[in-house]
């Protein structure tokens, strides 16, 4: 199984599929189609039914039930796009077999080293086979490891018809990394009772709580005048923006928060004297605190208007997704079952809140409860990204055993 996982992830990772938040199309980038078409062909060759890709790049397929009694239809999803934070062009995955510990030189000429000194969790992977980057790109295990695990699990079930399972629906989706993964997802057409995203991180992650999320763009308008004659005339939009940022709570930022603590994250700053734009993401697990964060943003904008003039500042803010716990709690057995499966495989479930979101965050509010399962990866979205092939195999086994367990329970 490991050989198949390596082969698939190597192939998928080399296909550039970065999304683009500035685009208005779905998928946001044409290159996502390259992997979508590859997967469509692969699923057809495996012998799945109902293999269809719609005009927006959502690829659906079915593994029919192999039992003669009713079992819930279960979905498994992963996203084809990779993050925009770091380049995903010309990905060249490296394989470290039977990692012996210590530093991993990703790129000697650029002196890029993956070291336990910087990433102490590496010490827990001694003896594992790791797939890393070459130090110049991200790897894309988020979420191509999830794709590889789903396809490999389905291939295994097809080769082992003695393993009982109900109907399985598969979906590979675009644009998750820019928050639009489910925007054009047809839940009725997918037709599953519930689903799981294979989009988590280290071994054992099992998540059904996510952030409430909003995005905000604050635009400041200045007045540019030659510096030599600027007294009492120039208004520097960058200084207006800096003062605005400094009014937000300094300790409520990603680098100073953890667990259930929310934050304001300034993730874009672009400007000159005449015009400056700040891009924020706003996050909190608690709905009331989330609303309070948005209210603070609106309050500060109002203050700036009163102090500097209506024309000096604009705010665009919109909700992106909500904490899926509210929709999953009523069907919590879909989480508990996977936790039981993990324990049966000797994996300790790590049921923790996601400090982020998955496609499941939105899908759960669209009527498809969708918790999130680990894939085995670490350090997503950068050149130090890597994945344990051993833990990819365990994630694949979790898929297989989850389907077996639901089939057995339906028979009881």
From Swiss-Prot:
Its EC number is 3.4.11.4. It is found in: Cytoplasm. One of its GO terms (biological process) is proteolysis. Zn(2+) 1 binds at residues 79, 142, 199. GO terms for molecular function: metallopeptidase activity; tripeptide aminopeptidase activity; zinc ion binding. Keywords: Aminopeptidase, Cytoplasm, Hydrolase, Metal-binding, Metalloprotease, Protease, Zinc. Binds 2 Zn(2+) ions per subunit. The active site is at 81, 176 (proton acceptor). The keyword Protease applies. Its main location: cytoplasm. Zn(2+) 2 binds at residues 142, 177, 381. Its cofactor is Zn(2+). Gene3D superfamilies: 3.30.70.360, Zn peptidases (3.40.630.10). GO terms for cellular component: cytosol. Pfam families: M20_dimer (PF07687), Peptidase_M20 (PF01546). It catalyses: Release of the N-terminal residue from a tripeptide. InterPro entries: ArgE/DapE_CS (IPR001261), Bact_exopeptidase_dim_dom (IPR036264), Peptidase_M20 (IPR002933), Peptidase_M20_dimer (IPR011650), Peptidase_M20B (IPR010161). Cleaves the N-terminal amino acid of tripeptides. Belongs to the peptidase M20B family. PANTHER family: PEPTIDASE T. This is Peptidase T. The gene is pepT.
